[in-house]
Amino acid sequence: MRVVSEFSKDGIRVSVFSWNNKYLLKYELGPMEQTFKIPETDILEESDLDSFYQGEFFDKVVSRFKEMGESFQKQLENL
């Protein structure tokens, strides 16, 4: 597995890996993570991956983290 890049954006850690002819985009926030697998054949240049760190896609990642966090917190309160 090759690390393509790692950085933080808006408090979310973003890691990009190349593995088994796929790019793995991993977003982490606290105890939660979201991972997306993209076939390398769908990406002409690694810079094409930048579209996954901005705009509507990234906004939905952030929104999903909020929803996940609320569900997780409710479940912890029910323990």
Predicted regions and their residues:
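Short amphipathic beta-strand/extended segments with alternating polar/hydrophobic composition
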Residues: 33-41
